[in-house]
């Protein structure tokens, strides 16, 4: 079966986050994993964490000392050392080999059915110019944030909000901005981060507004 969706993440010294996110995808979304490729962009591949991520991907056998068949079927481990920045996540869209891409942080878990629902959305709207995001679930697994409000809060632009009515309705709805721990789009419609961006943060509102200026929401 041809892969439909790339799920990719960038990492910098977070083997545990990569491990748990990928294993959760494989365990709790197994019904669609044959349609998914998984990639990791490692921004510090020579560190202890980087070496462990590579071993996890390539199936390192501690008994034989050999790399074996790999622990992530169809997965690709991609070292990237040209520069170090949170915006390396944008390379997920450049490396993806499918029409649709989901970029997420390497500590994010998705509720069962979420990947299937995203694939169904793209089946229905394969040319969409929209940026797709989702709610943030609280640790109690009962409460949610649905979006960020475009206002300043504690020296950060963006204040968490919850639209109860639209959330309970269950249909996709437009939001002003959101955190960028998870976002998705059609690969050919990815608008990209500014190539001069470095460091951490600042993509919230920027990337949503850029999609709006290119005809999406």
Regions found by a protein language model. Give the residues of each.
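A conserved hydrophobic helix/loop-capping motif in glycosyltransferases and polysaccharide synthases
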Residues: 5-14, 21, 28, 41
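Short, acidic, metal-binding catalytic loop of nucleotide-sugar glycosyltransferases
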Residues: 23-35
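A conserved acidic beta->alpha catalytic loop
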Residues: 40-53
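Glycine-rich, basic loop-to-helix element that forms the pyrophosphate-binding segment
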Residues: 80-96
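A recurrent flexible, glycine/aromatic-enriched loop bordering the glycosyltransferase active site
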Residues: 86, 162-184
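Short aromatic/hydrophobic "clamp" motif used to bind/position activated sugar donors
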Residues: 101
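Conserved donor NDP-sugar-binding/catalytic core segment of glycosyltransferases
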Residues: 109, 113-155
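A short, conserved alpha-helix in the catalytic core of glycosyltransferases
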Residues: 118, 183, 188-189, 198-217
């Amino acid at each position: 079966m041809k892969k439909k969706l790339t799920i990719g993440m960038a990492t910098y010294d977070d083997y545990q986050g990569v491990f748990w996110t990928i294993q959760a995808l494989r365990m709790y979304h197994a019904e669609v994993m044959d349609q998914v490729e998984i990639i990791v962009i490692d921004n510090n591949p020579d560190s202890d964490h980087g070496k462990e991520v590579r071993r996890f991907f390539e199936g390192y056998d501690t008994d034989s000392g050999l790399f074996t068949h790999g622990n992530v079927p169809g997965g690709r481990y991609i070292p990237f050392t040209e520069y170090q920045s949170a915006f390396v996540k944008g390379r997920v869209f450049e490396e993806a080999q499918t029409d649709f891409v989901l970029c997420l942080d390497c500590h994010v878990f998705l509720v069962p059915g979420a990947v299937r629902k995203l694939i169904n959305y793209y089946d229905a709207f394969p040319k969409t110019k929209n940026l797709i995001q989702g709610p943030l679930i609280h640790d109690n697994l009962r409460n949610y944030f649905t979006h960020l409000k475009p206002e300043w809060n504690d020296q950060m632009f963006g204040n968490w909000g919850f639209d109860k009515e639209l959330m309970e309705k269950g249909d996709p709805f437009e939001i002003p901005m959101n955190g960028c721990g998870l976002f998705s789009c059609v690969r050919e419609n990815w608008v990209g981060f500014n190539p001069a961006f470095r460091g951490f943060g600042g993509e919230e509102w920027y990337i949503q507004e850029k999609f709006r200026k290119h005809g999406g929401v």
